[in-house]
Amino acid sequence: MMKKVRLPALLLALLSLLTLCGCHGSRGQNAFSVPDSFDESRQYEITFWAKNDTNKTQVDIYNKAIDDFQALYPNISVRLRLYTDYGKIYNDVITNIATNTTPNVCITYPDHIATYLTGANVVTPLDALFADEQYGLGGSALRYDGPTQAEMIPQFLEECSFSGSHYAVPFMRSTEACYVNKTYVEALGYELPETLTWDFVWEVSDAAAAAKKPDGTFAVNGQEVLLPFIYKSTDNMMIQMLRQKGAGYSTDSGEVQIFNDTTEALLYGIAAHTAGGAFSTFKISGYPANFLNAGQCLFAVDSTAGATWMGSHAPLSDISADKYVDFETAVMTVPQFDPAHPQMISQGPSLCVFNKDDPQEVLAAWLFAQYLLTNEVQIAYSQTEGYVPVTAKAQQSAAYQDYLAQEGADDTLHYDVKIKASKLLLDNVDNTFTTPVYNGSASLRNAAGQLIEDVTKSVRRKEPVDAAYMAKLYDSVTSLYRLDQRGAMAADGSQALGPLPAPAKALLITLGGVWVLMAVYGGVQLIKKKSRQNSH
């Protein structure tokens, strides 16, 4: 009896091992190929995940774009899902990759797409679609007037090319700007230079923090609160500082270079200015615009895509009207180490098209994504903030040029700070740069900001920032963001295991034979059973 039980049990155990080994990888989609034609006899429902900056006008533009597109393509229905944070879109996409329930189109960033690409054929490479005569950029079969590939701003399109293909198209572009309370800077006896430098910003910020009245209030604003220099995205702060210094950040292949002597020197400098009360960050103190508009900040660095929140006449605000202080707002490039050769980051949302089992569904999604590049959508959306359109077709249009020309005509559509922010990027496209994109680049970006955040917090807590502190900081940030495990994260959030090792392959071969043994065993048992039945 024991012999009869042992063999099936052994085979079952070995089969379980085979199942576990099968978990090493997951089934991917088939590679996408462009259909010969779009099947208009079918109905399609596609999902579009988008971000809005808590801006109702942006939501209205999305909805109008969807309505107008559906009028052109009645057989394509678009469902919109809105987010207020790019990180949440990223996390939800990662979650849905494992169940093949990704959206058809989503607004995202190249760093995020690089992680999506660790899943097999998850994201649609767009080069063949770009070039398709009928449905590509400016294609002959399109029912709208979309841009040709030559009409895309080349620097913006290039940002969407990595891992050998274009995996996105740019939707909007922005950069960072320094929004300056010019009135307070001049009250301290300084004159703004043509190009901001780090030395100037630190000097003025230190002076503002040090100048107090006998009653303890700050001399420049007469208030008890003053944070002279506030930076919203400290990851960009560190990245731009390193770029301007010509120091290492990372290579295109993903080699981490950020832990260098220049980084350490920059962190010591930030610590020194923080100790004097000159510097803080969004994560530590709050939204820079709130302090700027209340007369509690002189230099507020934020995206040009946040320009409608900046200045004493800002149309959008998180503070009450009675907290506003009247001052002149200057919109300037981020501080530079070499003002003769300014360098600033290029950023902004891009459109990613996800692969599906049905290539017709992918084509329907591409038709919608491409519609978002039309002048109507590009110009309308760019006017909601200090964005710029990503096509020369839109930038050079009479409608957009008229919009720029009306800078300051009102404090809503033509709000001067917003249009100045857009012009800042338009004038500096050739001075922008992007960071390398690869699986893990998003983690390195977060780590860059974490270095500044941790140093700033430590100084405010009166902790010593010295060589021992720096060594510990580097170790903790490396561990937190797994920077010593390049490419270690797969699209589903698990470890990317890579090829099976030789012993595992041998085990799989052995287990393959188990199936044969099970079949033989089952056959033998069946023959024995029939023999016993015949003998009776």
What do these predicted ranges mean?
Residues 204-206, 251-285, 329-330, 334:
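Glycine-centered hinge/linker elements that transmit conformational signals in sensory
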Residues 19-22:
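C-terminal motif of bacterial Sec signal peptides marking the signal peptidase cleavage site
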Residues 38, 110-175, 218-222, 321-335:
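Hinge/lid segment of periplasmic solute-binding proteins
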Residues 158-171, 176, 200-256:
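Extracytoplasmic/periplasmic solute-binding protein
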